[in-house]
C-alpha cells in the first residue's frame, strides 16, 4: 500500500541519518505521540498529583485527569525525522546564512567524541536572540537532533505544527499551577531518562544588553530531581556560547531598558 511504502521510505531515511549522527535518534523520539501522552498521564507521580489536586479542590478525579490530559497534549512533541532533516535543517541553514556569516569560534571535538553513547547530552546555551533556536539546530544537525522548550509566542498555525515535528515542546513559562508544573517536570525527566539530546537556555529569556542574566534552574531541577546516579544514564552538560555582531531584536530589547522610552 501507499502508506506502507511511505513508512518504509521514512524508516530507511531514519536508519541512514542515525548512522551518520554522533548522537543517534532515540527510540523515545520515534514512539507514537499518543503513546507518550498516555505514558505521561499515567506516570505514578502525575497520578499522585491528580489525586492530591482532586482532594484539595474537592472535585472528581476524572475532571483533574482531563486537565492533565490537556497539559500532556500541549507539551508532548511529535518528532518527525523527515521534517527535521529534509525541511527544518534546510530552512535553518538558508535563514542562518542569509542573515549572518556563521562562524564556530572553538569546539573541543576530542572531548565531544569521548562522550559515552549511552549518556544523555544537554547543551546549556546563553540566550541572545530568537535566532538562537535556528542557529543551534543548524550547527548541531550534523551531530544530533535537539529538543528544547519553546514559549507560547510560537503557538500559531502552522508554526506550532512544524515546531512539534522538530521535536520541540511548548511551555507556559509563567505558570504557577503546581499540577501543570508536575506534568512538565515528569515529561522533561522522562525525555532526559530516555537519552533525548536537549538544549536548555538557562537564562529563561533573552538578554536585554548582551550580558548573561541570572540563571533560572527550573529545567535542570526537573532533569535532576528524580535522578538516580546508580540506575539512570549519565547526563553530560555541554556549555555553548552564542554571540552576534547585531541581533534582530536589538532595538526592541534596548528600549525595554530605557525607562523613558515610549511603550509600543
Spell out what each predicted region is.
Residues 1-122, 129-138, 160-167, 185-187, ...:
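Membrane-anchoring hydrophobic helices of lipid-metabolizing enzymes
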Residues 128-131, 205-207:
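Gly/Ser/Thr-rich loops at beta-strand to alpha-helix junctions
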Residues 119-125, 196-200:
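Generic beta-sheet signal
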Residues 171:
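Hydrophobic residues at beta-strand termini and immediately following loops
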Residues 138-141, 225:
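Short, well-ordered alpha-helices that flank and scaffold nucleotide-derived cofactor binding pockets
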Residues 123, 127, 139, 148-152:
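Non-catalytic terminal/interface segments that mediate subunit docking, oligomerization
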Residues 97-103, 125, 148, 175-179:
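Short, flexible loop segments at the rims of nucleotide/cofactor-binding pockets, characterized by
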Residues 1, 5, 13, 28, ...:
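A cross-family acyltransferase "interaction/gating" segment
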Amino acid at each position: 500500500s501507499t502508506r506502507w511504502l511511505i513508512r518504509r521510505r521514512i524508516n530507511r531515511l531514519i536508519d541512514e541519518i542515525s548512522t551518520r549522527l554522533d548522537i543517534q535518534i532515540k527510540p523515545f523520539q520515534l514512539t507514537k505521540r499518543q503513546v507518550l501522552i498516555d505514558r505521561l498521564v499515567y506516570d505514578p507521580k502525575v497520578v499522585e498529583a491528580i489525586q492530591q489536586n482532586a482532594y484539595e479542590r474537592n472535585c472528581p478525579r476524572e475532571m483533574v485527569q482531563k486537565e492533565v490530559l490537556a497539559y500532556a497534549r500541549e507539551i508532548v512533541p511529535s518528532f518527525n525525522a523527515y521534517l527535521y532533516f529534509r525541511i527544518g535543517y534546510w530552512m535553518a541553514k538558508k535563514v542562518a546564512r542569509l542573515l549572518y556569516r556563521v562562524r564556530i569560534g572553538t569546539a573541543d571535538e576530542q572531548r565531544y567524541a569521548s562522550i559515552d553513547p549511552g549518556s544523555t547530552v544537554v547543551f546549556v546555551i546563553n540566550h541572545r536572540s530568537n535566532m538562537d533556536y535556528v542557529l543551534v539546530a543548524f550547527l548541531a544537525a550534523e551531530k544530533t537532533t535537539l529538543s528544547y522548550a519553546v514559549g507560547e509566542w510560537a503557538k500559531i498555525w502552522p508554526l506550532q505544527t512544524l515546531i512539534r515535528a522538530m521535536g520541540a515542546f511548548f511551555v507556559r513559562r509563567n505558570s504557577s499551577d503546581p499540577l501543570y508544573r508536575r506534568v512538565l517536570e515528569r515529561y522533561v525527566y522522562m525525555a532526559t531518562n530516555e537519552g533525548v539530546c536537549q538544549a536548555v537556555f538557562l537564562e529563561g529569556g533573552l538578554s536585554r544588553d548582551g550580558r548573561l542574566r541570572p540563571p533560572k534552574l527550573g529545567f535542570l531541577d526537573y532533569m535532576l530531581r528524580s535522578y538516580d546516579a546508580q540506575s539512570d544514564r549519565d547526563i553530560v552538560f555541554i556549555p555553548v556560547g552564542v554571540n552576534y555582531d547585531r541581533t534582530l531584536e536589538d532595538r526592541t530589547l534596548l528600549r525595554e531598558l530605557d525607562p523613558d522610552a515610549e511603550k509600543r
